[in-house]
Design a protein with these regions (language model features):
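Extracytoplasmic/periplasmic ligand-capture domains
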Residues: 37-46, 91-92, 135, 139-202, ...
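Extracytoplasmic/lumenal ectodomains and periplasmic regions of secretory and membrane proteins
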Residues: 657, 661-693
């Protein structure tokens, strides 16, 4: 009995106890799984109900948000929301129309002859010695809150004379106790234009501005001399350089007329100047911000205009976590602007005029999160966690439309979820280029070398079958093969017109351009000194380096593999040197690239904006310009200078035709393709209209957070039946184990009790 009784109590403690513990553990596990399944949102609970737009950025944080230096599309997603150039573009009207932003009106230049006497508006370009723009500033415009403007009760700046200790570990302007503001004045625009003569940071459009802004070249030389004096006794690698105060030195080409008027003086006639005034390069910069960020420790703490811009626009940077997250919030000092009431005929039907006259911006916060690969970005959009995939990239609508075309199930899902993919025909291009400073593919040191290198470039240009690659294979990001540098839709472009083609890469067959056979490219390669892709003298294989501006993720690997196959047609080995965009920028600035991949989204609607990408003085490696190929041809450069003063008309067309022909023959680019464009929006995002030129789009967008919350819950409802089934199976296993264990214990107890009659 003792044994039996003892055995029974032991089973309760050592049998029921563990079973109950296991059961409790399994229950807790199931509850935890169910709870986690209820919400897979990447944001804190309740974020979907806030008036915040969520979207993503690629790979790395923007490198330059300083408006003097910033000239990359990923950076425009921030600069155009924060800064306000003098002009902008009407959001809805096409063709594009300039409208005033921080200026109170769009002004026409006054023309002067060499004696300073006024000329009529229709004066011939050769008679115009000077163009004068008197630009009125919108009154009452206030800067965002920032410690650079903060003053004490005596009117003294609180934070413009700090030492390293006073800064401490502050890494955000918002960490300072006091914030201030002030009104926008004409001096801020003059200061901004002067900054293009800086020696401290990259100034990519200095070479363009210096050709036209009166005395800007001499001013740059003066600034360089003065800066050398400031830095003379300091270590060369010092981060904390003393404040370079451009107010000290006057510039004849940019002056203050009065508090609310500034004057620009240009040499000759340059009609495109008004377009430059719609870009952040001429957005106002308060000297206080420049002085604030020049103080000791600021650079070390990541405090500069490149991370923390200071503007008058609808948004301001409130969070900058490098390579993770950026947040822009509504600028409390922004004056507000009315949503447009005028648009194209189709805009009314699309609902784009429903907010006519209402005050913008409509959205309180813009939260941008890093997403390194395309697949998770697309999935989060389909789940409703991104309102748009990326705000600045114009190809997402094409990608999603291609997915829908390839699958009826995908098409039904997209339609059921109300995704919107508006398409556009806009002005941009992608191209493969050659660094003309390179000893193998470049200009060459002698006429003989020049001829051979040109034939090598031409052979490669023939071999790359853009029609196949980006017309058929990569249709989700493709377009129409380019025959020259000027995209369709601009005056002067002949792309797509009957009889126009690139004679180097194509020939006419039945009146249509057809790519030349690979035999033509192979023959050119022989003349270039590389028969079969080998050096005719040494017999060594020709190996070329391809600098790609993105890290190789799965979606880019197939494209780069395809590109390598194009070179392999000629027996040329292509080494892929892929980097992130910031490293790519460094490499091209230093001239260390050989063959490269690049694209251009129009800054303004004029062929000149694409033809300047091959203008010699605009060299990337020599002048920090946007001529990444570092191409220089005296005939082309002379035509470009002539082009700059021409209005649309036969004379301008003739000049463009000559420039295109030169670029085709010299082949500094293998050209590429003009991409199809389209955006992607959730159903709760309204007022979305695709455009390459309009980058301050966020203020026009409107959200319906309540609808977003409902749809996110609907689209991400947890699928719990597999977990219930797993739980049932686990419970059944526990029950079976308990029953088996109990049976064994019972059998053991019976063997331990003596049989009847035994003592």
């Amino acid at each position: 009995m003792v044994a039996a009784g003892g055995g029974g109590r032991a089973w309760t403690a050592c049998g029921h106890g563990p079973a109950r513990a296991v059961l409790a553990l399994l229950t807790a596990l199931l509850v935890g799984l169910l709870a986690s399944a209820c919400n897979n949102s990447p944001y804190p609970a309740g974020a979907e109900r806030e008036n915040t737009m969520f979207y993503s950025f690629d790979e790395r944080s923007p490198r330059y948000l300083d408006p003097t230096a910033s000239y990359a599309n990923p950076e425009s997603a921030y600069t155009f929301q924060i800064y306000e150039p003098p002009y902008g573009y009407h959001y809805l009207l096409r063709p594009y129309r300039l409208i005033p932003k921080s200026a109170s009106e769009v002004v026409k230049p006054k023309y002067l002859d060499k004696n300073g006497q006024p000329l009529p508006d229709d004066a011939p370009a050769e008679a115009i010695a000077e163009s004068v723009y008197d630009v009125p500033v919108t009154k009452g415009v206030m800067y965002q809150p920032h410690p650079a403007f903060a003053k004490d009760s005596q009117g003294r700046y609180r934070y413009l004379a700090m030492d390293r200790a006073a800064l401490g570990d502050k890494r955000s302007p918002l960490a300072f106790e006091h914030q201030g503001t002030r009104e926008l004045v004409a001096e801020d625009f003059v200061y901004a234009l002067k900054r293009h003569a800086t020696t401290r940071i990259e100034a990519p459009v200095y070479s363009v501005f210096a050709e036209y802004v009166l005395d800007l070249k001499d001013y740059a030389a003066l600034v360089k001399t003065e800066d050398e004096k400031l830095l003379a006794k300091l270590p060369k690698d010092i981060q904390d350089k003393p404040f370079l105060d451009f107010r000290q030195w006057p510039l004849a080409g940019a002056t203050v007329v009065d508090k609310y008027t500034w004057r620009i003086r240009l040499k000759g006639k340059y009609p495109q100047w008004s377009y430059w005034m719609a870009m952040p390069f001429l957005a106002p910069i308060p000297w206080e911000a420049d002085a604030f960020y020049a103080q000791p420790g600021m650079a070390e703490n990541g405090l500069s205009l490149n991370q923390w811009p200071v503007g008058t626009g609808p948004y301001m940077m409130v969070e900058f976590v490098r390579d993770r997250r950026h947040v822009m919030a509504r600028n409390p000092n922004f004056r507000g602007e009315p949503y447009p009431c005028e648009g194209m005929p189709e805009d009314q039907a699309e609902g784009l005029l429903a907010d006519c006259g209402k005050t913008m911006p409509f959205i309180d916060r813009l939260q941008v999160t890093i997403e390194k690969e395309e697949v998770p970005r697309k999935e989060k959009f389909k789940q409703g966690y991104y309102d748009v995939p990326e705000i600045e990239r114009p190809e997402w609508g094409v990608k999603f439309r291609t997915d829908a075309e390839n699958s009826d199930d995908v098409k039904r899902q997209y339609e059921a979820r109300g995704f919107k993919f508006p398409l556009m025909t806009d002005i941009s291009d992608w191209y493969l280029g050659f660094n003309m400073l390179d000893p193998v593919v470049g200009q060459g040191a002698t006429p003989e070398q020049s001829a051979k290198h040109r034939k090598l470039r031409q052979a490669i240009a023939i071999a790359i079958d853009w029609e196949e690659g980006y017309g058929r294979i990569f249709r989700h990001k493709g377009g129409v093969a380019a025959h020259g540098p000027v995209p369709p839709g601009l005056f002067g472009s002949r792309e797509g017109q009957p009889g126009f083609f690139n004679p180097v890469t194509h020939r006419l067959v039945d009146g249509k351009p057809v790519r030349r056979p690979i035999a033509d490219a192979q023959a050119l390669l022989v003349e270039a000194g590389y028969p079969g892709g080998r050096d005719a003298v040494s017999g060594k294989p020709l190996v070329l380096n391809y600098d790609f501006q993105r890290a190789i993720t799965p979606e880019f690997k197939s494209e780069n593999d395809w590109m390598a196959k194009q070179f392999a047609k000629l027996g040329i080995q292509l080494e892929i040197r892929a980097t992130d965009f910031n490293q790519y920028q460094d490499k091209t600035l230093k001239g260390k690239h050989q063959i490269f991949w690049a694209g251009w989204l129009a800054d303004y609607p004029d062929a000149e904006n694409f033809l300047f990408l091959l203008y010699g003085p605009n060299s990337k490696s020599k002048a920090s310009g946007e001529n990444i190929a570092n191409y220089q041809n005296p005939a082309y450069d002379a035509l470009y200078r002539q082009l700059q003063s021409l209005e649309d008309g036969p004379a301008k067309q003739a000049v463009i035709d000559q420039m295109v022909a030169i670029s085709q023959q010299d082949s500094p680019w293998a050209f590429g393709y003009f991409p199809w464009g389209g955006l992607a929006f959730q159903q709760w995002v309204t007022n979305g209209k695709p455009s390459i030129l309009i980058r301050d789009m966020a203020k026009y967008y409107r959200l319906d957070p309540a609808l977003r919350a409902r749809k996110q819950a609907e689209w991400n409802a947890p699928i719990v039946w597999p977990m219930y089934m797993l739980g049932a199976l686990l419970l059944a296993a526990v029950w079976a184990a308990r029953r088996s264990y109990r049976a064994r214990e019972t059998a053991t107890a019976r063997r331990a009790v003596p049989a009847a009659g035994q003592v």
